[in-house]
Amino acid sequence: MPFGLIAQEKEIKSSNYFDDLTLEERKIIVKKGTERAWSGIYLSNTDKGMYVCKACNNPLFNSDSKFKSNCGWPSFDDEIDKAIIRKQDYSLGMKRIEICCSNCDGHLGHIFEGEGLTDKNIRHCVNSLSILFIPKK
């Protein structure tokens, strides 16, 4: 199959995931934005369950990995295996590691290491608008 057709199919597949998102969700998930600190619906959520990608419902984080980091966004010290891809991010004049959904490539937030906030020494800093919480039944 010619390269152009493969790229076109991928674009169509990806855009379908994002069709039902609100404008604000698209700004975060598709345009790689960041929601205002302390504004996210899941920041203080302590219920048991799972967090999935808002765009494609790919399981991302178990609630057991969520912790209070006082950074203004939901934080997790572990991810579900193969749920997330990491990308170098040089925006805003600094080097960071962006995290995206491994299924739809939607922007989730950034990952930080070496802060000493948990025993795993890692913080997935996630936009609430990028995720959906599924309560444990």
Task: Tell me what each language-model feature is.
Residues 1-9:
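Bacterial Sec-dependent N-terminal signal peptides
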Residues 8-137:
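A short Gly-Trp-Pro
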